[in-house]
Amino acid sequence: STSVSAQDSSNVVNASLDTLVVTATRSEEKIKDVPARISIIEPQIVEQSPIAELPHLLMSDASIDMLQYGGYGQTASIYMRGTNDTHTLVLRDGVRLNTGSAGTASLSFIDTTDIKQIEVLKGPASVLYGTDAIGGVVQLVSKTPEKTGAFVTGEIGEHSTYKSVIGADLAENGIYAQIRGQRLESDGTQVTDFKDAQVNAGAYDQKGFSAKFGIEKEQYAASVDYSENQGTSTYVDGINDANWNLIGLKNVSQDFKNEIINVKGRVNLSDNFALHARLSQFKD
């Protein structure tokens, strides 16, 4: 296993006082007005790491301790303020990604293609979010289209890692729509000293798509967001003999699939009062 503790926060951009955050109070506010301590992994950091999976991006924040076994798709745990990994809540646009069975989020299987910024709330937040947030909260904030256009991108990394993304955005008069499709493949990081190519692989194959539609006006707003992410993660399995030598090594594959549905609405009843509603679901 590999244990990484980020000690240098220079990669985490110091947000301006007017930067908007939603994690501290569950509503959009300027960072200068929120009482909680929040750091932000901002868009330029996310965009400079197009192939990076979520655990790699979170290592940019010095308040987070990360433990990951192997490379892409391998088990990763996040620790904040000395608490257990089940005490850090992970959200995407307000939707809980922690599973009911494990109590943690499958960080390695969360696609980061559409992430605008990552907000890290440091310290207890149980009053707002429940016991999952004793250590803190990590909120993934997705992008909202700002202009109409289409794009195709491709990225290449080490260990035969490839990522391609295709997408289109529409934004006009407060109405927006977005569609994305992406594919990530990697031969993975060698996790044993054995030279047998059949057991050294930690291959990862993941594909997904997302779509959103919304309207944003001064007095009201509504949006529908759907994303699906699936693939196969391969890891090495074996047993120890009487001398603690690994024997019977073989590749084991794990299929995964997750999907998020998020429907939100807002109506401003007055200058100081707004009504918010949300219907969301996460399947893993």
Give the predicted meaning of each segment.
Residues 95-122, 143:
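Short acidic/polar hinge/loop motifs at secondary-structure boundaries
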Residues 1-49, 55-59, 169-170, 207, ...:
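N-terminal Sec signal peptide and the immediately downstream disordered periplasmic leader
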Residues 89, 149-151, 161, 176-178, ...:
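Membrane-spanning beta-strand positions in outer-membrane beta-barrel proteins
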Residues 139, 155, 167-257, 283:
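Periplasmic-side early beta-strands and strand-to-turn transitions of outer-membrane beta-barrels
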Residues 38, 46, 58, 118-120, ...:
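Non-catalytic regulatory/gating segments with a bias toward low-complexity or hydrophobic composition
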Residues 19, 116-117, 142-156, 177-181:
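Transmembrane beta-strand segments of Gram-negative outer membrane beta-barrel proteins
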Residues 18, 76, 136, 148-150, ...:
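Hydrophobic, lipid-facing positions within transmembrane beta-strands of outer-membrane proteins
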Residues 55-95, 99, 116:
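Extracytoplasmic beta-strand/coil segments of soluble accessory domains associated
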